[in-house]
Amino acid sequence: MEGADLLMAGTLFLFAAVVAVPLAARLGIGAVLGYLLAGIAIGPWGLGFISDVDEILHFSELGVVFLMFIIGLELNPSRLWQLRRSIFGVGAAQVLLSAAVLAGLLMLADFLWQAAIVGGIGLAMSSTAMALQLMREKGMNRSESGQLGFSVLLFQDLAVIPALALVPLLAGSADEHFDWFKVGMKVLAFAVMLIGGRYLLRPVFRFIAASGVREVFTAATLLLVLGAALFMDALGLSMALGTFIAGVLLAESEYRHELENAIDPFKGLLLGLFFISVGMSLNLGVLYTHLLWVAASVVILVVIKMLALYLLARLYGIRSSERMQFASVLSQGGEFAFVLFSTASSQRLFQGDQMALLLVAVTLSMMTTPLLMKGIDKWLSRRLNGPEEHDEKPWVEDDKPQVIVVGFGRFGQVIARLLMANKVRITVLERDIGAVNLMRKYGYKVYYGDATQVELLRSAGAEAAESIVITCNEPEDTMKLVELCQQHFPHLHILARARGRVEAHELLQAGVTQFSRETFSSALELGRKTLVSLGMHPHQAQRAQLHFRRLDMRMLRELIPEHTDTGQISRAREARRELEEIFQREMQQERRQLDGWDEFE
């Protein structure tokens, strides 16, 4: 693709995303489906702005590559070892069971047995990009079903290697004398990558970080991700698997969070590009010609995979309320099918339009998943949020709560328990089904669902409540909820959790003055104890803590208009001098006073 064409394609991608994704979000169908629809619109079977789909699809796989690197950063080797049973047990069972059933059905549809095996394996794979994105949107990351879903996806990435090796064997084009030397060199190269990454990556990043230039650190991160992807691709292995391993090797390093911040913007854009490319690849001509066959294939594919996944989730011990989410989020075909079917086609395993039909079915199955998840969310909401009889008298009797608490993680639990202990009527909104079930067993009033939906807030009693306490893990969710409450429920007194100073500034700019930085108070308390351990009188240490809190809050408010690092550093130095002067005056005053109290009195 020429430079001018590439620039035009990039402009079209951005325009399509800017138009389609907000519309999809407004319709409630999710960003992923918005990207897919945008791809259909600008692709060769839509408005025809872009025709070179294969080249763009290959480039857009970098979105999956970046995503797997970030996932690897979140899993250290010990955690990965803990997941071995679900990876090689449930993951292997899902691929084998789904592939066997789907291959049998393809043989009934007049596919050659070799093509049916390849087709069954390809269709058994799920979309890593779509499933992980939807799991994050639905808050499944920390749930048991989300962890199991990730394990299945990881095994599918591992299964890419033998699946690709199987194609020439089925086609009868494999070399009579297997080249063990090449295989040995690939294994050796892979081992060198693991050992080199284990012992070299941290010293290299330590050297780069010492330069103090953030742009160089970002460039080094991109080099690592792209280098690992190209290295694995040259070995004929999965690019995503290579970057995942690189992420795992750095998961316990001190640079983990900085690496995530450097990669995150690229990951989001490239994932969007990937979904747009998948939408562009949808062959509407084949769809029109074989409409009934394709429609039946999509339904059968989704149903079979859901049944297999649901059965495995039940055998694994997943809660009944989470099984449907787990089965649905992995029910689609995946991006690996494009690679596997192209390889099989080059070996002449498919006849006529068979490959095109399978790819259309895979693409359409990916479009059904966001809609399926939305429908299951509504079903779960009716099931979990509807009237329920309890053996014991429920804690909350009044339908009109005084306070709505959003989120029941570690932060939200402390707040909710304090309010409950003081007989405050509360309603908790939570996206984790496990937490919902647990709270309902204790008789607490809890709603399952996404709190950024206006109707859910109304159902929870937002129109009658006095306050809302927002304890979301993600700052983006917090700000979205603040804006929603200010627009639809202006009477609510908003209290929010801030993860740090940046989030605190954003809340202040949005007009939220009542917030708590999650580590600030505990850090101050430990600092006070440190002063006492150094010999300072407990009363004096307490006053030092209060002065520091007051001055820090004043600085926080004053620095809102400051947008330059120079301005912030200058003001911070000034505040430190001011704090030292206050402490000096306090110490002189305390020396004149009698020891009136002790820490433990």
Curated annotation (Swiss-Prot):
UniProt entry keywords in alphabetical sequence: Antiport, Cell inner membrane, Cell membrane, Ion transport, Membrane, Potassium, Potassium transport, Transmembrane, Transmembrane helix, Transport
Domain of life: Bacteria
Ranges annotated as spanning the membrane: 4-24, 29-49, 55-75, 87-107, 111-131, 152-172, 177-197, 222-242, 262-282, 284-304, 324-344, 356-376
Compartment(s) of residence: Cell inner membrane
Primary location class: membrane
Gene Ontology CC entries for this record: plasma membrane
Any GO molecular function: glutathione-regulated potassium exporter activity
Domain RCK N-terminal stretches: 400-519
Record carries keyword DNA-binding: no
GO biological process, one term: proton transmembrane transport
Membrane topology recorded in Swiss-Prot or TrEMBL: Multi-pass membrane protein
Known partners and oligomeric status: Interacts with the regulatory subunit KefG.
Family membership noted in the UniProt record: Belongs to the monovalent cation:proton antiporter 2 (CPA2) transporter (TC 2.A.37) family. KefB subfamily.
Role played: Pore-forming subunit of a potassium efflux system that confers protection against electrophiles. Catalyzes K(+)/H(+) antiport.
Protein known as: Glutathione-regulated potassium-efflux system protein KefB
Organism: Salmonella arizonae (strain ATCC BAA-731 / CDC346-86 / RSK2980)
Gene: kefB
